[in-house]
Amino acid sequence: MQTILEKLYRSESMNQQESQQLFSAIVRGELEPSQLAAALISMKIRGEHPEEIAGAAKALLADALPFPRPDYPFADIVGTGGDGTNSINISTASAFVAAACGAKVAKHGNRSVSSRSGSSDLLAAFGIRLDLPAEEARKALDELGVCFLFAPQYHTGFRHAMPVRQQLKTRTVFNVLGPLINPARPPLALIGVYSPELVLPIAETLRVLGYQRAAVVHGGGMDEVAIHATTHVAELNNGEIESYQLTPQSFGLQSYPLEALLGGSPEENRDILARLLQGKGDPAHAAAVAANVALLLKLFGHEDLRQNAQQALDMIHSGQAYERVTALAARG
């Protein structure tokens, strides 16, 4: 371990195996707080490489509680958080709409990082049980097309890093790991990142981790597909990565200002999304969710983004997405 730490102090990068070794020690609580802080800051200053991020993700997945992985195609839709926009929970709403469109979504999430309401905060406000046992969550995925996996329930080793992360008060590799350590190990993922510089490195990390198809996005300051600006995308498909840009017009949608997507407390966000998913919501909110669902559906092989967005809007207006919310809450 000391050899790996010395390497970091010399600003050298680790290979995947070394990173996996380091992060295995971290989640087992084997590092002193000072060593952990030094390792995280050394990586941050030099810039984390895809092989290192992948090694860390593998260590955390190896340490995670097991989830009965389905053999059918399913996806995660998740953002790093930390984009500072305090928007409504677009990815959470998108998971329910995508499920209503026939996709299977196992969403991995946590409590809020930067906004006043993370995906877990919102689901709790809907009365959805966060700590559903793995077998029951899998059943929800089979039957409703959507389930939610609460990170602290599966990743108990994370707690060893928490005090140091809180003291450092700065982003570290842990801020990008959340979306990469879904215990269900989905083959498909739509991942939003808080900075455009992360789009390609995270796509490369997903390639190392063996994802079949995934899209990493950043849109105008948001860790989602944007309807107020251009979205930068790196799409991984069978080992090849293609970078491109999308605008609201790519989805046949009109643009809306970022202010139109502002969220509030978990209770306020719940009311906003309840109206939206019942087909009575704000057109800007519907457009934002439709754009994200459209790109997610592309990963399942539905290549026409405009058609996908229209299907998502139809599903939103029909109120069928909200039935998934109430059905999931009823399993509590």
Swiss-Prot record:
InterPro entries assigned to the protein according to its UniProt record, in alphabetical order: Anthranilate_Pribosyl_Tfrase, Glycosyl_Trfase_fam3, Glycosyl_Trfase_fam3_N_dom, Glycosyl_Trfase_fam3_N_dom_sf, Nuc_phospho_transferase
Listed GO MF terms: anthranilate phosphoribosyltransferase activity; magnesium ion binding
GO cellular component: cytosol
Cofactor note: Binds 2 magnesium ions per monomer.
Binding site for Mg(2+) 1: S91, E224
UniProt EC number: 2.4.2.18
Top-rank taxon, per record: Bacteria
Keywords: Amino-acid biosynthesis, Aromatic amino acid biosynthesis, Glycosyltransferase, Magnesium, Metal-binding, Transferase, Tryptophan biosynthesis
Gene3D superfamilies per UniProt: Nucleoside phosphorylase/phosphoribosyltransferase catalytic domain, Transferase, Pyrimidine Nucleoside Phosphorylase, Chain C
Binding site for anthranilate 2: R165
Binding site for anthranilate 1: G79, N110
Binding positions for 5-phospho-alpha-D-ribose 1-diphosphate per the UniProt entry: 79, 82-83, 87, 89-92, 107-115, 119
EC supergroup of this enzyme: transferase
Assembly description: Homodimer.
Family from the record: Belongs to the anthranilate phosphoribosyltransferase family.
Protein name per Swiss-Prot or TrEMBL: Anthranilate phosphoribosyltransferase
Phylogenetic classification of the source organism: Bacteria, Pseudomonadati, Pseudomonadota, Gammaproteobacteria, Enterobacterales
